[in-house]
Amino acid sequence: MRKILLPYPAGCATGTFVRRVKRFSVEMTRDGESVWVHSNNSGSMLGLLRPGATMLASPAANPDRKLAWTHEAMRCHGDGPQGFWVGVNTSVPNRMVEAAFHAGRLPWAQGYDTFRRERKRGDSRLDARLDGPGLPTLWVECKNVTMVEDDVACFPDAVTERGSKHLREMMDIVSRGERAAMFYLVQRPDGVCFGPADVIDPQYAALFWEAVDAGVEMHPHRGIVSPAGIDLGEVLPLTRCR
């Protein structure tokens, strides 16, 4: 069996989702007690945060952190055989693209031998810069996808000015002769294709297709989420969300 690229740390726990407070705090119950969990997801997590649903949390690496747990995933459609996990930790795509690069599992990055995270370009800081002998610099920006509508995995799940800025930056990169790639990690199993959520953020959706026409590469990969961790799955085809 192939090794999972991003195993969860030891000591993860499941509990019952109660509520979300002030965007970055989530209350869950575990063994009858209330536990507060940190969420780094600023999106709406539309359709996922249902009271009574099972959630997965990992222990904080820093034992002195105010909230001792980090929100990793939500169970969708119950705990039975029809249910599945949806990964909600927005740091996962960045870690996944790096792990997949070093494991040789990014076909669109073949030939590149240097991966540098969080690199500055002008006034922006992008998630990764890849370089290789005789190849144009490849800039990568990562996004987490948790929403599926009518079998289409969609991004974003809330209006994102920052996301629109990133698309403009990527188009500028291509115009200057370098490569630019968006890495969308769809952390759920039920979407069969991927597209921008024009109903939620029409500006982002318009810029997405403008970026495609300009030569920005779109790489929506499936993330295979289980209680053991997250692995990288197949690339999803693009479609328009209508």
UniProtKB/Swiss-Prot annotation:
Domain of life where this protein originates: Bacteria
Family of the protein in this entry: Belongs to the SfsA family.
Cited Gene3D superfamilies: 2.40.50.580, 3.40.1350.60
Name of this chain's protein: Sugar fermentation stimulation protein homolog
A GO molecular-function descriptor: DNA binding
InterPro entries with a match to the protein in the record: SfsA, SfsA_C, SfsA_N
Gene assigned in the entry: sfsA
